[in-house]
């Protein structure tokens, strides 16, 4: 992880 998708899913 650690991409923009991970940030949006939090």
Swiss-Prot record:
This is 28 kDa cell wall protein. Its main location: secreted. Keywords: Cell wall, Secreted. It comes from the Eukaryota. It is found in: Secreted, Cell wall. It comes from Nicotiana tabacum (Common tobacco). GO terms for cellular component: extracellular region. The keyword Secreted applies.
